[in-house]
Design a protein with these regions (language model features):
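C-terminal and inter-domain tail/linker signature
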Residues: 1-171
């Protein structure tokens, strides 16, 4: 494949990610036996990729991916992207909060015979969970004392309170 072919296939596939009715076509760019690296668990192949993205879209129905940079060389494409969405369904065990997220990610693709045959995914899940208020960083910095864990944002506190109220109202 030429650089232009790879660029077109990659651009088209990631544009499909944002089309509610065309999301299934996102997977057309991938080989059935695509090797996946960096995804949670032991996901492999097109079925694993599909399961990951369908869970993401269920949790964040308005998820939008914007390719910020695309570099193509040889049989590889490197993407720097921004992923945004609103938490409307369960995500990695976290019930919906109604909060939004905005993260950047990196992906490296290897293509052959007109399909993505290997993908290296730089995980964004922890950054998303932090923005949803589900996890907190309490990491010591070099030369500094360990700090108290950060408090949840006002929006995260409000969402947690709403969730607790809904759970209390449920039978």
């Amino acid at each position: 494949m030429s650089d232009n072919d790879i660029r077109a296939l990659t651009t088209n596939a990631f544009a499909r990610f944002n089309e509610d009715e065309g999301r299934a076509a996102f997977f057309d760019a991938y080989d059935a036996d695509v090797a996946l690296h960096g995804y949670p668990g032991s996901l492999q192949g097109l079925d694993g990729l599909r399961a990951f993205h369908e869970a993401l879209w269920e949790a964040f129905p308005d998820a939008r991916l914007t390719v910020e940079d695309l570099v193509v060389e040889g049989d590889r494409a490197a993407l720097r992207y921004r992923l945004q969405g609103t938490h409307r369904g369960p995500y990695l065990g976290v019930p919906p909060t109604g909060l939004g997220f905005d993260v950047e990610g990196l992906t490296l693709l290897r293509l052959a015979h007109g399909r993505v045959v290997e993908e290296w995914h730089s995980p964004t899940e922890l950054a998303i969970l932090r923005q949803l208020g589900a996890v907190h960083a309490n990491v010591p910095h070099a030369g500094r004392e360990r700090e108290e864990p950060p408090r949840r944002s006002a929006a995260a506190e409000a969402a947690a309170l709403r969730l607790e109220e809904r759970q209390a109202e449920s039978p």
